Amino acid sequence: MAPSGTVADPPQCSTTDSFNSSDTAENDIRPFFVLHKASSGNHNGKLTGIVKSKRRIESPSPKIAKRSEVESVEEEDGQFFSTLRFKVFETVWSKIEKTIEDVLRNSNSKVFSGIHDWIRESFESIISSGALKLSEAVRSYPVLTQASSKQLLTAMVLTRNLEMVDDLLTFEELELHLKSQGCHVAKLSSMDFSAKSGVGGCLRGLLRQFVMPTVDVADVTILASWYRENKNHENPVVIIVDDTERCCGPVLSDLILILSEWAIKVPIFLIMGVSTAHDAPRKILSVNALQRLCATRFTLSSPAERMDAVLKAVFLKPCSGFTVSHKVALFMRSYFLCQDGTLTSFVRTLKIACLQHFSLEPLSIMLEHFCHDGVNQLSGEGTELLTEATMKHAFDLPSVTRNKITRSTFEMLPHFLLDLQRMPNPWSIVVLCLYEAGKFDKLRLLDIFCEILDPEARYLKYFSPSEIVNSQSHNSGRNNVIRRVLRKLRDLSPSQLSSMLKSWENLTAEFTEINDKVIELHPFMRAVEAAGQRQGLPNSPKKHASRSNSKLEKELKAMTDKVATVIEFMLREYMKPVESVPFHEILCFKNVDKLQSALLGDPRGRIQLDLLESHDILHCVCCSQRGTTLLPSMHDTSILYKLAQEHADVINLHDWYQSFKTILIPRSSKAKQKSKSSSKSKKRKEICEEPEAPAEALIQARFCRAVMELQITGLIRMPSKRRPDFVQRVAFGS
Amino acid sequence: MPPKEESSKVTRRSTRSSASVTVENSEPIESHTPTIDDLTFGEESITIDAVLSNFPGRRSQIFDFIRLMGPLDCPTLPIMIYGGASTGKTSVVLQVLRHLNRPFVYSSCRTCYNPRILFESILNQSLLHRKCSLNGYSSAKRCDKPSDFVNLLREALSSVIKTLESTSETSRSDKPDEKPMGKMVYLILDNVDLIRDWDKGTIILQFLFSLYTVLKMPQLGIILISGLPPDVYYSNMGYTDPIPLYFPEYSEEDLRQIFLRNQPNRKLYSAFLDVVLKPFCRVTRRVEELSTTFSLLFRKFCEPLDDLGISPNEDMKRRLYSHLKPLIAHCLNEIFRVSSHPHDGETRGERRQKASYSSENREELEILDFHMSTSAKFLLLSAFLASRNPATLDASMFDSTGGMDNRKRKRKASEKSMEKKEIAEQEAVMKGPGSFPLERLLAIFQCIASVGDSSFGEEDEEEENTTGYDKENNNLMSDILLQVSSLCDANFLIKSGSCPLEGSIRYRSMVSEDLAQKVAKSLSFPLSKYLYRR
């Protein structure tokens, strides 16, 4: 993961005869200027370099002096940019991270406010039903009132994700939110509900958070007494259990039964985080405890919804300028869907991609100016960093060479960078319009984002007339996003079309070209609505009750065709993939292989292959001579694993050890050679070459170490109590 | 547990005896210092008729209890009050003591969940001690051994009895109107059946049952309230048997009287009870449960009405009944109900969507409503198949081409073998899902994940990106043991014992077939092809 300290030097520029004398003079002046700039940074070594270069200029061989100057300049640029790139990375990533945190906080704020409103409403109704006197509140026997129901007010917060990683932060923020509103909040996790410590463990956890950290005995009466002191009774008591399904069921049931006994004296609100379904406590709790819960459901946004919000904030709205290529986006989507499905891992993936981008691409320092959105800074200060070496590198980028841009137009570089900076604006507007259209089919922004990044723009073929006709019969079209949007358009009702056009108009308000196209659709929309009103059934265009209904169908079909035309216009004109723009390598990360190796590592089968074919990796001399024969010079783990292939799933340890011992002792090879009756000269040669036989204890030690390594790797399982002579081979993923 | 009854708020009169008690620590004025009066119920005494009217159906139990308590200052034997849950045991005891105005100490073995907390709770009340911030929320005396408890309790009770005697003499001369408290102190232990589940619970139970014999204090009366009958606590130790007093379940007429109390419109509620009381009494007779359900149903019952004060006629009764009828069967079977809060944004969105997509209502019900990663889904299906299918069929079921379609034909089964199959099928249903080792789960996962990869491969081939196929395959297999751990945390997999031969852990799938179908549908996986049907 650590980036290489030295950056590969860009290819040297060969001096050609095309330079005239005046150009040569200008070229000589520029390096002095750069050297002077670098020396102002308190680099003592550079002063010596300057002196040396001056001497070389005075030397009688001017060509050699020029080359040395160019080399020193290039080395200097590499070192300088390497330091600067990490500063820019920290700037860019901190902005991305803050954006993500703000988005995640806002996505849950509505649910948090709903929970707090529910708590306050219920708390007010409890208080209004009769306030208890102090002596009544702290007594040990139950209060006999009309509303003496022992129901415990409970909020079931549905996280809708199997993994708990994202939700730990969510419940911490819920705790802070409720505390800021004045509630007394305690948070318990599933580790507090262990069968060993029983109900006393979680009560002690509660009292430590509410009353004081050193409570001798965990007693509920302490909570009741504390609640009546120092105006504590003016606010409700909230207990958050963030991962309910992982708790020990009997202990949680006992806690609920105890708290419900005291629910009148201490208004307690229970918040339980549930990941699968809101009736999941039915499996965990006892019947008595379930009857004590007066449950209300709250639903958090799903991981897919939060993913869409994060994507919109980081990649579609002006954030940092950093973006990823089509392949990288596909990999990140696959990692989110196929692995653990948590937003935490997605953010980690994004950070690794960003870090690798800054460590590999020298020109990524330009992102600092993109980050600040300073156009003037780009044209002024930014160009000072563009030395001749970086100019060479910029014009050697693949996107530049493909577009046949030559060095003669290097004065145009600020112009290209300005276009590169401004490009995301119409692009993101079109993406958001597609997202609005795709919402009717529950399309996710992640899928849309991955498809439209395609550098070959394959989605444009769906707008051809033949494709539209054939789209009905394609079964595999389900997985294609743009095609689904177009097919869904035909099923929309007039009211849905109208709402979509309104949202499109809002999105494109700042972009006149697209907004005019959307506004042109208004007369057709009004015609459709008029036809619908005449029919009297605006939401059911499919019925064939009369001729006016067929007229409505015609109007609707014409309308959807025009909407599809607008979509095609938006895609063709403004949906240019970032990878088709010159100089996009400055802000776009493309190396998907590095990202994959950083995240996934090698699959489990790779371990087995490496052990079986160690020669292919080591390329040692001894193994190549003998072919596939086992040799004592091989690694012990490889020897043992190859021997294990001869056994079934269950390996006898004694047999395994004997085979291992046979490999290590060279006496057996002597006997084999003798039995073959080879020549005397071969005998002498082998006697001299073979090392001494290792001791029995050493063989056993090496055997035990190798077996232990195989166990740690997960390839075998150690003997069980009933069969101490055998180990079992774990064979999967091969 | 207790039936509903109103509690009148009365300012407690301060007596001269409370002023005479010396306070060791000076506390703030707001806080309350426990006095000897706190041992009584603390409110104005009620008449016997009030007690009887508060508890319909408990007349004989109340009179028996008062008779067992005996007249003022009369020693009494230990009493055990037992019966099912929510039959009024605790409430009757407390109200009778309120009627008699006698001092008592109450501790529940649910709140006091271990011996130390129980002992210290009793001692704190006897010593008029309350845990607060001034004393660091600590008990008056530390006590976690039965022998210490006997000595400390004897000292505390002796002190209380002396105070009661002096108070009794003073109140006779000054306030002849007030009911005397007497010199008896009653120790009430509630939920004593929970002690059996404690650590060393048997020893504690024997100790509590012999407490009367050990203490030998005639001024102490012991009342045990239990959910189980006295036969459960029988042991060989010799102690005084408590006098049993049984609280049977309420009859239907008793329940009617209980629920009709304190209703603003008795006629309307009586019509409601005519509809709901009979079917619900077959399910449960617990007042606590019925009260919760009835309050929900009554609101539904009254929805068509504008005025809640009217007397319904027959036609109106029929209309209200038809309005309520669809809910009754639903509530009869449901134990745990989760209501929706109006602030839940997701519910609003879902409702709006359902309104606009009426044709897709069924699809929404079938959609998996929480997020799982793809590998976790395949693993869940693997666990489901491993639990349902016999292990011997894995080789034929999960070969390279996959599925049951490979079978050319089945043998025609005779009636005898079909009968045997039906018997075996019923036995399998009774046993529930089977257990499987981890290796079998991972082998099945590898097979069906490769089937799933081929569908991914189709998508990638369409996009002319063949490298994606290999990467997808690698993606599904990594961190597979972490996915197993996640499924265990979510209670989709549970560990069920160990294999008797090899000692390894075996797993069991707790996934319902509906959930498995949902997961398979989200993956486009042909689950029915791999599921063995007997």
From Swiss-Prot, chain A:
According to UniProt, the tissues expressing it are described as: Follow a cell-cycle regulation with a peak at the G1/S-phase. Mostly expressed in siliques and flowers, and, to a lower exent, in flower buds, leaves, roots and stems.
Record field: compositional bias (Polar residues): 12-24
Report the subcellular localization.
Nucleus
Q: One Pfam annotation, family name? A: ORC3_N
One of the GO BP terms on file: lateral root development
Q: Which GO terms describe its cellular component?
A: nuclear origin of replication recognition complex; origin recognition complex
Residue ranges, annotated region (Disordered): 1-25, 532-554
What induces or represses its expression, per the UniProt entry? Regulated by E2F. Accumulates rapidly after cell cycle reactivation by sucrose addition following cell cycle arrest mediated by sucrose deprivation.
Q: Where is the signal peptide?
A: none
Q: Which GO terms describe its molecular function?
A: DNA binding
Keywords (A to Z) from UniProt: DNA replication, DNA-binding, Nucleus
Q: Give the quaternary structure.
A: Component of the origin recognition complex (ORC) composed of at least ORC1 (ORC1A or ORC1B), ORC2, ORC3, ORC4, ORC5 and ORC6. ORC is regulated in a cell-cycle and development dependent manner. It is sequentially assembled at the exit from anaphase of mitosis and disassembled as cells enter S phase. Interacts directly with ORC1A, ORC2, ORC4, ORC5 and ORC6.
Similarity comment: Belongs to the ORC3 family.
Q: What does this protein do?
A: Component of the origin recognition complex (ORC) that binds origins of replication. DNA-binding is ATP-dependent. The specific DNA sequences that define origins of replication have not been identified yet.
Protein name, please? Origin of replication complex subunit 3
**Originating species:** Arabidopsis thaliana
From Swiss-Prot, chain B:
Q: In which tissues is it expressed?
A: Follow a cell-cycle regulation with a peak at the G1/S-phase. Mostly expressed in flower buds and cauline leaves, and, to a lower exent, in roots, leaves and stems. Expressed at low levels ubiquitously.
Composition bias type Basic and acidic residues, residue spans: 414-424
Can you cite an annotated GO cellular component?
origin recognition complex
Alphabetically list the UniProt keywords. ATP-binding, DNA replication, Nucleotide-binding, Nucleus
Gene that specifies this protein: ORC5
Protein's cellular compartments: Nucleus
Q: Which domain of life is it from?
A: Eukaryota
Give the GO biological process terms.
Answer: DNA replication
Q: Which GO terms describe its molecular function?
A: ATP binding
Gene3D superfamilies for this protein = P-loop containing nucleotide triphosphate hydrolases
Keyword Protein biosynthesis among record annotations: no
Using the record for this protein, list the coiled-coil segments as residue ranges, or answer none.
none
- Any idea what this protein is called? Origin of replication complex subunit 5
Give binding positions for ATP.
Answer: 83-90
Induction summary: Accumulates 13 hours after cell cycle reactivation by sucrose addition following cell cycle arrest mediated by sucrose deprivation.
Indicate the family of this protein: Belongs to the ORC5 family.
Q: How does it assemble?
A: Component of the origin recognition complex (ORC) composed of at least ORC1 (ORC1A or ORC1B), ORC2, ORC3, ORC4, ORC5 and ORC6. ORC is regulated in a cell-cycle and development dependent manner. It is sequentially assembled at the exit from anaphase of mitosis and disassembled as cells enter S phase. Interacts directly with ORC1A, ORC1B, ORC2, ORC3, ORC4 and ORC6.
For the motif Nuclear localization signal, give the residue ranges.
129-136
The protein's organism comes out as Arabidopsis thaliana (Mouse-ear cress)
